[in-house]
Amino acid sequence: MYEDVEGLQDQQCVIRQIQAQLYYGYEYMGATTRLVITPLTDKCWITISGALHIKLGANPAGPAGTGKTESTKDLAKGIAVLCIVYNCSDQVDYQMMQRHFAGLAQQGCWTCLDEFNRILVEVLSVIAQQLQEIRKALLMGVEEFVFQGKGIKIRPEFGCHITMNPGYAGRTELPDNLQILFRPVAMMIPSYELIA
């Protein structure tokens, strides 16, 4: 972590990882326990921070119990940004996601869309359009933009990440226009020797 004094009116704490520069969020999470850092966790964090640097999300994918959601949540906790986990199902519709994204973009929070590939493919197509609108606003560096026909504010700290478990039945393939919005990271069963 660094204190950034160049080019800013108010001094901010900056987290730098490889080329990514993320701002400390000052969101108090309480005195909670932290995740054990393994090479797998480190790889996931580097992918997430690299994705955020280019205004994309991350896509940790792998079997159950590999730490996909927990790694995302713990990085958010480490840089003091609120991360809302949203458990996806085939009941999710595009209007739910529109409200979810609008609220998070205005607050500068992260979301982790857990089991994202459970959502119906028709809904995923609309979600891709929604996320492309948000990414375009982030790339332009604007403070306000029109999201699905409604003007909203946006904070640059916003991040949307998804987790997928490709092995389960009833999962859909992500459309191409959605896949390009997320950097993939393969998660596997961690070495229990490192954790113990």
Locations of regions flagged by a protein language model:
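Walker A/P-loop
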Residues: 53-86, 100-103, 126-128, 133
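Conserved alpha-helical scaffold flanking the Walker A/P-loop in AAA+ ATPase domains
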Residues: 49, 92-115, 144-153
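Conserved catalytic/switch belt of AAA+ P-loop NTPases
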Residues: 101-102, 117-155, 159-168, 176, ...
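Extended, charged/polar low-complexity intrinsically disordered regions
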Residues: 1-39, 43
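Conserved AAA+ ATPase core "coupling" helix
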Residues: 95-98, 171-196
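Phosphate-binding P-loop
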Residues: 40-41, 49-55
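Loop/turn-to-beta-strand initiation segments
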Residues: 55-57, 82-84, 107-111, 122, ...
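Conserved nucleotide-binding/hydrolysis micro-motifs of P-loop NTPases
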Residues: 66, 90-93, 117-120, 160, ...
